[in-house]
């Protein structure tokens, strides 16, 4: 999947992915702040929402655009795509379709922007894993709770020592390793405390 995506890219905007398999961790909120912060800093920014079911990021961008128009303000608003998951009866066809949709969106955006901010759903999916593997920077927001930490590692309930790597951290480790093997680049991974 990453091989095809890398071959399909035409330029080199910095891709920032907000990811965490746990819902409610603050991915869409942080994605909105990152995108607007970059716009306010004078950067050219585009955004992609991969959570087509919930569309929190998409609604934020659309509401910002509509409010600016109603208020007559020249407010910074990024170019935006919302990408749906494939819905055929064949997994391979869905994955091919999702990969192509993401390639097309990134190609349409990255020639004209400095940053692409991608918001992912709070579930494991092919499209989410593909986005993770294409990140230059991955930001994982999490709340200050052992329930949120559970996607990163197992914790001994008595000593609070980390006793193992959990499913999400294992997936991130895998895509980072694959990216290094493919093109020699590193994915910077930032785990941030949210709502502190």
What are these regions (language model features)?
Residues 1-10:
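Pre-Walker A adenine-sensing motif
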Residues 30:
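Hydrophobic positions on the alpha1 helix immediately C-terminal to the Walker A/P-loop
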